[in-house]
Amino acid sequence: MKARSLALGARLLLRHGWPRRVVTTYVGLGDELMTAGAIRELDVRGRAGGTWFLTRYPELWRPTRLAGTFLPWDPAIIRLAERLRRPVVRLGYSNYDAATDYDKPLPGHAIATFCRQLGVRGRIELKPFIELTPAERKGGRRFGRQVVVQNSAEGALIPMSVKRWPSDRWDKVSAALRGDGLDVIQLGSPREPALDGAIDLRGRTTVREAAAILAESRLFVGLVGGLMHLARAVDCPAVIVYGGREDPALAGYGANTNLVGRPPCSPCYFRTHCPHDLVCMDMIGEADVVTAARDRLMRAGERLPVDTDVIQ
């Protein structure tokens, strides 16, 4: 193991030079996309060069015009940085206590928090980031009137049962959209339940292919998670069944239609423990989602506003 670490370190230093610092983030796709938004802000200020960014999704960065070095996540690289006395920045926007199941959020939007932790100052855009080639975008057009629906987040690396919305309601949403003449595509993990009547692409796309499909879709309807962030990164309008677990101001986007439930216990920031039978999700009916989706489809072609913040 030591020999491997030494060989890895020598190879990286020879190829990329001495790092100014090493940056790592959470394991989720959405977290990585929000990190990409913060890195973009670092890059436009000319301060991304010389930084090693550790990624669990290398394909997100191929290609990229951003400065910096993007390396597959490896704890050996962190150990190397520590031996070289290079700063290691561990990005995060909450502190999770497994004993209480409580995810205590840091103040502000996650992208703003990441920017602050990276030393970015001034006006920033609260938008995740991915670059697609024209050929990739063209490949995302699968059907004439395509919309994307995600009916579960159970396939996430850190699944949160408090985000669950009943499967039968998702099936009714799918039926209504198909009744409107739309081609409903289901994206997500093969571990998630099939959506009745949808074109099933669960587990059959890469992250970049999913991004391209979203980029060429009229609408995304889904839950808080990686696909929500991916849709925002490619400017796909979205209706998000948010519920009440968290405030959209933490990691959501004003460009989306965010459907929230606000019982007295909300926001709770629990991951799996709900003593109230997910009342915040139950408050959102399928008619609410269908109405919101139809409203967004009627506004097709509108330029999506970009949220901003100022980091002091």
Residue ranges of model-derived segments:
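Catalytic machinery of carbohydrate-active enzymes
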Residues: M1-Q312
